[in-house]
From Swiss-Prot:
Gene3D superfamilies: Ribonuclease H-like superfamily/Ribonuclease H. Belongs to the RuvC family. This is Crossover junction endodeoxyribonuclease RuvC. The gene is ruvC. One of its GO terms (biological process) is DNA repair. CDD domains: RuvC (cd16962). Homodimer which binds Holliday junction (HJ) DNA. The HJ becomes 2-fold symmetrical on binding to RuvC with unstacked arms; it has a different conformation from HJ DNA in complex with RuvA. In the full resolvosome a probable DNA-RuvA(4)-RuvB(12)-RuvC(2) complex forms which resolves the HJ. The active site is at D7, E67, D140.
Length: 157
């Protein structure tokens, strides 16, 4: 089972690929997709879409796990995040992949044991739980690993 975890965002989207081979979890890859805030939104969404498509084609995930989003007090920010999620979900649908959504607190509790863990705690635990993640320093990337990890350990596939 190969899971593509996504921490959705318009400016700095985290992605990670984690596999389950028999009883062992294996970190395969991760990264950040950054878009330029000066670019038109449709160009930013197209860039996210095309970059994630390359990840899907390279790693052939069985499923995508994505973080659920909360409605921000800033409606413009929430709307832009909704655009990014829509572009991602359209791509997931185009490749006929299954998708699971996880609340941020569920991911934090699964990884750290505490549903309100800070970003540095998440990063620390990801490095302990999955070998190969020692070089990850970006919290968006670590969150994507945590989302994929949560999908696999909760057997939500």
């Amino acid at each position: 089972m190969i899971i593509l975890g996504i921490d959705p965002a318009l400016g700095s989207l985290g992605w990670a690929v984690v596999a389950k081979e028999t009883a062992q979890l294996k970190y395969l890859a991760s990264g950040i997709i950054r878009t330029n805030s000066k670019d038109a939104i449709h160009h930013r969404l197209a860039f996210i879409n095309s970059t994630l498509e390359k990840v899907i084609l390279e790693y052939q995930p069985n499923m995508v796990a994505i973080e659920e989003t909360f409605v921000n007090t800033n409606s413009v920010t929430s709307l832009k995040l909704g655009y990014a999620r829509g572009a991602i979900m359209s791509l997931i649908g185009r490749y006929n992949l299954d998708m699971r959504e996880f609340k941020p607190n569920t991911v934090k509790k699964t990884v750290t044991g505490y549903g309100h863990a800070e970003k540095d705690q998440m990063l620390h635990m990801i490095k302990l739980l999955l070998s190969g993640t020692a070089l990850i320093t970006n919290s968006d990337e670590a969150d994507a690993v945590a989302i994929a990890y949560t999908c696999l350990v909760t057997k939500n596939y």
